[in-house]
A protein has these predicted regions:
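Membrane-embedded alpha-helical segments of transport systems
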Residues: 51-56, 77-93, 111-118, 147, ...
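Membrane-interfacial segments at transmembrane helix termini in multi-pass membrane proteins
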Residues: 238, 263, 267-273, 283-287, ...
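Alpha-helical transmembrane segments of multi-pass membrane proteins, especially transporters
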Residues: 25, 33, 37, 45, ...
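Hydrophobic alpha-helical transmembrane segments of multi-pass integral membrane proteins
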Residues: 37-61, 177-200
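Single conserved hydrophobic/aromatic residue that forms the stacking wall/gate
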Residues: 1-7, 303, 308
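Membrane-interfacial helix-loop connectors
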Residues: 49, 61-83, 91-113, 188-226, ...
Length: 308
């Protein structure tokens, strides 16, 4: 834990101070243009997080900018909200790893085909190109290929568990809102990645026994768990840097409390018929995206931010 804390702090300080020295006023002016309205900030946060596939990493970068004085807290809030939406894109990308084609277009889009093609292109860019930009693109493509292959392997390993009574009982236990939320928070805090937890849920869904009632509370807790590395990175930051991390946590806590109270209160009255619906990887990705977009909309509507 101490190593992780020191690493997060080092990344934050080196990145923020280094960018300020290299780019100076130009980067500061660029950041202002891209975040001078809340909508622009949300769009920037969504775009950046979609590329790097980590809301925590995006927020750590933002904390570095705020800590070095290149960005004001008011500008950072929009990016943080957008990061919560952008991280849900990974779930949709992972859906590709569950395409099991036997012929035609489905076979072309299968995990094995996509992973192989992407890996080959990545290796060529990594080995043959001299420019660092091309090499970095190659690294991204290799990482994507490994991610797809890993998800397919994990799904294959989890699939036989559907016949295990112990595994079935465990998933049923997650339908308890409190237990499910705590599992989502704890699991994401350990993995330090909301996308990884969503990926694990998608892998569990291939067993055919993961229901909406078990998946929903876990998804609710994912955002709060993802705040752990962000809070760690804020240790040693100045006042505004710490407040930036706190905004991230407050937004996710607000979404967790708001939607859990509304959903389970209404369910107690009307008894939703989809609670026992079997979840698929696409359904998990959709649930995660809808929850995050709804949270951002609710936060924007209530203007839940720290005073600047």
């Amino acid at each position: 834990k101490e190593y992780r804390r020191q690493r997060q702090m080092c990344i934050r300080d080196r990145m923020g101070d280094g960018l300020k020295m290299v780019a100076g006023n130009k980067l500061e002016a660029f950041l202002y243009r891209m975040t001078n309205t809340p909508l622009k900030g949300v769009a920037l946060g969504t775009g950046v997080t979609s590329v790097i596939q980590s809301s925590s990493a995006t927020t750590v970068m933002v904390i570095g900018f705020v800590n070095s004085g290149m960005m004001k807290l008011k500008q950072a809030i929009g990016i943080i909200m957008g990061a919560n939406i952008g991280t849900s894109i990974t779930g949709w990308i992972l859906c590709l790893s569950y395409i099991d084609g036997k012929n035609g277009i489905a076979k072309i889009l299968s995990t094995a085909t996509i992973s192989a093609v992407v890996a080959i292109i990545g290796i060529i860019l990594r080995m043959a190109c001299k420019r660092s930009v091309h090499k970095n693109i190659g690294n991204i493509m290799l990482g994507f290929a490994i991610l797809m292959t890993g998800m397919q392997t994990m799904s294959g390993a989890v699939s036989p568990l559907k016949d295990s009574p112990t595994f079935t009982n465990m998933l049923t236990m997650f339908s308890n809102p409190l237990i499910g939320i705590l599992v989502g928070i704890a699991f994401t805090a350990v993995l330090q990645s909301a996308s990884a937890t969503v990926g694990v849920l998608q892998a569990l869904s291939v067993t055919g026994i993961l229901t909406f009632s078990s998946a929903f509370p876990i998804v609710l807790g994912i955002g709060v768990g993802a705040a752990c590395p962000v809070l760690i990175s804020a240790i040693g930051a100045n006042k505004n840097g710490k407040r930036t991390a706190l905004v991230y946590l407050i937004n996710d806590l607000f979404g967790l409390i708001l939607w859990s109270v509304i959903f389970y209160t209404v369910n107690a009255v009307v008894h939703f018929g989809f609670m026992d619906m079997i979840m698929s990887p696409v359904a998990i990705a959709l649930l995660n995206t809808v929850f995050r977009v709804a949270t951002v909309c609710a936060v924007s509507y209530t203007h839940l931010t720290l005073p600047t």
